[in-house]
Regions:
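Extended mid-to-C-terminal alpha-helical interaction segments
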Residues: 209-211, 215, 220-324, 328, ...
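Helix N-cap / beta->alpha transition motif
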Residues: 104, 254-256, 334
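N-terminal, charged low-complexity regulatory/assembly segments
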Residues: 1-223
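Minor-groove-contacting beta-hairpin "wing" of winged helix-turn-helix DNA-binding domains
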Residues: 328-335
Length: 352
């Protein structure tokens, strides 16, 4: 029989503020992560053509500096997203470069090994970072495990390179990538600015929780210990993916920016019809109709790999059909309400 005198206090998630912010500095780092990494090129809306143009534009000096610094560890650049915000101003690439030049080399390498992540903000965490930077092999492995900031090999590479050389290479890579690839291919500054401006009026009437869901198209975030602010940053180059990183007490969520094109079908309409035009995604929706599920549960029920499901879930989320709940564990579920396909199509072709 249950003990009727036993009570358990469950604390509510801590409050947080949500803020919209854009800048080409964010977009450049996200593009650099794509250029650096080895994820499937066709998983991005920009497609293989973007990668082909970027590779053709990049100099051998850029490629050499990049490989020396981070190898093919694309997500390593996410750890500098907070530095764009910290730099202030227009949050553009030049401001980021100026901020890095004015930073101590120790601060730059600390950020790149994950030292600004909340998991390492404690006294124990900072001691671990210090030991790793001093060259202790076990500390580097423990740092990678605790921060989840990539494999320990990537952290060891940075530590062996040294703080001053890491800073020099970081400046060279970001500067060259900006001049050779990012700017010539188009920074999308106007579209990014328009996305934030378009959401600003609605944002004033929303709670922080509502703004996160509204901006990201289906991410539910209730808050967590150590996070007091959520920075919502639009991105075009990484569509349909959402990038999530942390910087001290700030969670940074880079969501897909809207990019309407006059004369062409509404992008949201295209995404909805594309999402529904696949048997696997329809099975996913039916499974989620029964309740929220973790990725591992979906993989087991549908008999698919997690990597395959990630792609399908990204398409469904981009279409606004499902939501992702962030917390102790990530869960996927259906968003309230379903799109009226007849109305969407009728609006486009001009028939009531």
């Amino acid at each position: 029989m249950a003990n009727q005198h036993l009570r358990q206090a469950v604390s509510a998630p801590p409050p947080f503020a949500a803020v919209l912010e854009w800048g080409t500095g964010y977009e450049a780092l996200l593009a650099l992560s794509m250029f650096t990494g080895d994820e499937r090129q066709d998983s991005y809306e920009v497609g293989k053509a973007w990668f082909a143009r970027a590779r053709a534009a990049a100099s051998s000096r850029l490629l050499t500096a990049l490989r020396t610094l981070v190898g093919t560890d694309g997500p390593r650049w996410f750890l500098l997203l907070g530095m764009v915000h910290e730099a202030g101003g227009a949050h553009d690439v030049e401001r980021l470069l100026s901020h890095i030049r004015g930073s101590r080399p120790e601060d730059v390498i600390t950020a790149l090994v994950g030292g600004r992540l909340p998991a390492l903000r404690t006294g124990e965490g900072q001691s671990l970072v210090k030991s790793a930077l001093a060259g202790e092999a076990k500390a580097a492995a423990a740092l990678a495990e605790r921060s989840r900031a990539g494999k320990s090999a990537g952290i060891r590479r940075l530590i062996q390179t040294g703080a001053k050389e890491v800073t020099r290479l970081t400046l060279e890579v970001v500067d060259r990538f900006n001049r050779e690839v990012f700017n010539p291919m188009g920074s999308s500054a106007e579209a990014l600015s328009a996305d934030v401006s378009g959401k600003a009026s609605s944002a004033r009437r929303m709670s922080s929780h509502q703004l996160v869901d509204f901006s990201t198209g289906g991410i539910t975030y209730e808050g967590e210990a150590g996070i007091d602010r959520v920075l919502l940053v639009p991105s075009i180059v990484t569509r349909p993916w959402i990038t999530i990183s942390d910087w001290d007490s700030t969670k940074i969520i880079c969501y897909r920016a809207g990019r309407p094109v006059t004369g062409e079908p509404n992008r949201d309409m295209v995404l909805v019809y594309r999402a529904l035009g696949d048997e696997t995604r329809l099975r996913l929706l039916r499974e989620l109709a029964a309740g929220d599920r973790r990725l591992a549960e979906l993989a087991q029920v549908l008999g698919l790999s997690k990597s395959t499901l990630h792609g399908h879930l990204a398409v469904l989320r981009s279409a606004g059909l499902i939501r992702l709940s962030l917390g102790a564990e990530k869960k996927y579920g259906l968003r309230p309400g379903l799109p009226d396909l007849n109305r969407i199509l009728a609006d486009y072709i001009g028939r009531a």
